[in-house]
Regions:
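Short, solvent-exposed helix-helix connector turns and helix-capping sites enriched
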Residues: 32, 64-66, 293
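N-terminal mature-domain "stem" immediately C-terminal to a signal peptide or N-terminal signal-anchor/transmembrane
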Residues: 1-55, 59
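Acidic/His-rich structured neighborhood in mature extracellular/periplasmic domains
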Residues: 57-215
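Short, mixed-charge, low-aromatic patches
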Residues: 43-54, 146-153, 180-186, 222-232
């Protein structure tokens, strides 16, 4: 297994002091020439060349008490004091990706402070993990910035799945020319099925970012869920409101039931992909991911809950 070492940009960032801010910023640019400009521009929203404004804004960002950034930074150092297990879990995930796709080059990974802006940040060369988005579902300052249903995945142990799934969505992009719900949910469901194979020691609800109760509700009501979708002929609809209702995060999936968790369409896509692989044992994971015909997958899956 190839060991991944996460770069602790967060630690260096928290060593910035107001009295020496200009020098400290220069040091950050020197030590992190690839990540620092991206963090300044994409996370803080400050033009990288505007050093005067950055020297003024950075201490405010680090010491803010209105949104709780100062308290959050201290909490982040506590929660992420030891990241050995985190690095091991991510290493395991990417080792399995490389087994499936040997050409995979593992990006450099950075742990950073996002100001509650970004759990996972990507470009072609690196991955950033917004540590302040994973301080625990019960972290008090989350009440100010997120909805209750979003807190479920704001835990340190959710990071490996978030990183690997984000990487797969980026490297295995949606290529279908169709935009029906069926196509979208099969694409996303296939990716989550693959993530579940990579982290085969995790229960399904952890992969989905749900509670165990939410997962069990879907399993117990799977037939009724499918009947609702089919009766409404939602699979073949292309309206954005329908697609977002089934695929986006939310407190529930209103298209089906107030009791159905958000992103229910992705779960259905996963279940169809799982059934497809069960009934077509000669198909490899790589072939599943490369198959862009959602109608074909649905028909050959023999999915009938």
């Amino acid at each position: 297994m190839q060991a991944i070492e996460i770069v602790r940009f967060d630690n260096s960032l928290l060593n910035v002091h107001e009295a020496s801010v200009a020098q400290d910023i220069r040091v950050l640019y020197e030590e992190y020439p690839d990540f620092m400009p991206l963090w300044v521009e994409d996370i803080l929203g400050i033009p990288s060349a505007d050093t005067a404004y950055l020297e003024e804004a950075l201490p405010e960002f680090l010491n803010d008490t209105v949104y709780g950034f100062k308290q959050t930074n201290a909490k982040e150092q506590e929660v992420f004091a030891d990241i050995t297990d985190l690095q091991h879990a991510i290493s395991k995930g990417f080792t399995r990706i490389q087994h499936l796709y040997p050409e995979t080059e593992i990006p450099t990974m950075y742990l950073f402070i996002s100001g509650f802006n970004a759990p996972v940040y990507f470009n072609d060369e690196l991955i950033g993990i917004g540590a302040d988005m994973y301080l625990g579902s019960d972290y008090e300052y989350y009440n100010r910035v997120v909805y209750e249903y979003q807190k479920q995945t704001m835990r340190k142990e959710c990071i490996p799945v978030d990183v690997v799934s984000a990487y797969l969505f980026r490297t295995l992009p949606y290529t279908s020319t169709k935009s029906r719900l069926l196509d979208q949910m099969l694409y996303r469901g296939k990716v989550m099925y693959l993530v579940a194979q990579i982290f085969d020691d995790l229960p399904g609800y952890e992969v989905m970012g749900w509670t165990k109760e939410q997962w069990n509700w879907c399993v117990q009501n799977e037939r009724a869920i499918w009947h609702v979708v089919m009766d409404k002929r939602d699979l073949f609809k292309t309206e954005s409101l329908i697609l977002t209702g089934y695929l986006n995060d939310g407190p529930f999936t209103s298209e089906v039931s107030q009791d159905a968790p958000g992103r229910l369409g992705i779960w259905l896509g996963w279940r169809i992909a799982e059934s497809y692989m069960t009934h077509n044992e000669d198909v490899t994971l790589q072939e599943l991911m490369a198959e862009g015909d959602a109608q074909k997958i649905l028909e050959l899956s023999l999915y009938k809950p």
